[in-house]
Amino acid sequence: MNAGKEFNYYTYQSDSSQGSLQKAPDENTDYFTHKMNSYLPFDMSTLYANQPTEKIQILQEIYDTERTYVKALTIVDEIFIQQLNLWCPKSKKCFRSMFGEISAICKTHQILLESLQCKPIAEVFTKFVPFLKLYTSYASHYPNSLKIFAKLMSRNDFRKALTKIEEDPRVDGKKLQTYLIMPIQRIPRYIMLIQNLMNYSTEKDDMTNLYKALSGMQGLSDQIQSCMTAYENGERLLQIQLNFGLDGHILEPGRVLLKEGMLYKRELNGSANYQETVVFLFNDILLYGIKRISVMPLCKYEPSAILSLRHCIVQLDDIGGSIFIRCGDVGVDFTAYSLGGVTEWYNEICDAIDNAKKLRDTLRKESFKQKSLIFDKGFWQRNRDKLRNMITADMTGNISRVLTRKKPAPKLEESDFLRGQWTTSTIASNQRKRKVATLEDEEEDVFNMLSSPNLSQRKRKATLQENTPSGVGWTASPRSSSFRKRRASTLRNKNADVTDGNNYLSHLVLNDVTMTQPYTGLNAFVGTPKSRTPTDDDYDSDRDYVWTDDEEFVSDDKKIPIRRVASYDEEDRRPRDFSEVRRSVASEPPRRHLAVDDIRKLSYQQRSLEPFNMVTEDDDEDDIIDIKVKGERPRPWWETESAPPAIKNQKSSIIDSIRNSCAIM
């Protein structure tokens, strides 16, 4: 502690008999006490000696209430605000919103209190009315201040600090809420005191100034009331918008809620079916919907339609006790529990329509441009699509790959084929590679044996029959027997050399079998076949020509040929059979196991993504979401039966968990 603070901390204002020093009050306490003592009492009779006693009493009441009010504002400004900012520094932003302009109001009324001691009261109020517009901002944010106060009370540090401040004797035992509501009550108190003062005033100038002050106070009070009403109306509009689960259309500038209640909507086909409907009447639109049972606390209603009042035609049926409203292509028939309720709603709607048409002439921009906005099943369908997109985006990459199968499949290369298209096991692909390498060695041995000059004709024929190419990727052709006869007759020539053997293998063997792989090691041994011009065998003369629409004869030079379909399937590279039955591949190695992983992923994707629980009983069968990929093949029975029971039963649990965490409707 330095010398200055130590000197201020102790004082020698003590009795002469006591030698010890007394502890001085704190600096803040001295400043607050000095400021509170500066608001001295004042006798208004000294300033208005010639006035009646009743008028002096009213003037004295104005000054005394103003002095008490300024003291209360000083307590809030000097004790509550400063101490809370000191003990709860993390909540300073909340404190600024909670107290608002109360510090500026306090300084204004301090000057007003000093002016009442030396100037006529009518002149003072006339001069200070423009500065009292600070109450408009404070009053409009007062409901929000109460919400912030309730939120801060949930914090432990704020409660402890507030309790210590309220226990301070300088606060006079009042709560913080009592001080916050004082500015709201002050303006009506001014109006009442000025009206009482005008009853005892006789001078013309004094009456004129008092009337100006009274008019200014009444205008300020009306402005404060309108601001508070607008704030409450905005809060109510936002609550209605959230209750219907909408992102807009309700909370708009200038929109006011006029009436709300429950009506019964009757079907227009004449049947006696009534549906309980909640109706909200605004100054420019009419909103109605039905109650919905939902786990979410906000979404209480399901919107049916929004009607623009300027385009509505209303008819009252006194006999049937109903109101018929038509807006464009929308027509609705409402009734109430009693006939008096129907008449009351009819009068309110008619008055709102008349006012909307009158106000429209002075508006440059309309808040609701459409005649009617119908929230049909398509509205909820779009929300279901949003939910489905969110679910799809959160899935793994494997399911995303299945969803993108509608795109054209890329052309497979040799490496892609050797790995296998659908088989997930690397053992099968490695076995296929080893089989191809073994087949290359066998063909090379056969070629060496055939080209040997010491080989007899019988042994050559037997060797060729035993080593006919039949293995992975080879399929025997139906014409194999005829080609074998020609091959046997060709090999009878004892002078066959290596060139004839190469020509034989390139022209006869390749035509004899069908290759299902685009390229293997056999091509290096056999040699690449030479390019030739297409023949008649490459086309189908009966089916592959395109005829004109009038079916006239087209000459051969004008016919448009169509290539045959590839002899192998683009998906798993198996040979294609045009009778929709796949032929078995000759000497194909047995698959290690079925592609269970891929089948489970596909089954899980098709069983879990479709939000069945979101489809209500009112939806038609055509409205059910179908997320089946376009161009997808029908699923075989083994894929359907291979999904484990845990994945099958997981459909409802996933959607229920999503519905408990999302609220898009």
Swiss-Prot record:
Cystine pairings recorded for this chain: none
Gene3D superfamilies noted in UniProt: Dbl homology (DH) domain, Pleckstrin-homology domain (PH domain)/Phosphotyrosine-binding domain (PTB)
Any one GO CC term of the record: cytoplasm
Recorded GO MF terms: guanyl-nucleotide exchange factor activity
Disordered: annotated segments: 456-489
Sequence ranges assigned to domain DH in this UniProt record: 54-227
Record-linked InterPro entries: DBL_dom_sf (IPR035899), DH_dom (IPR000219), FYVE_RhoGEF_PH (IPR051092), PH-like_dom_sf (IPR011993), PH_domain (IPR001849)
Protein name: Putative protein tag-52
Gene: tag-52
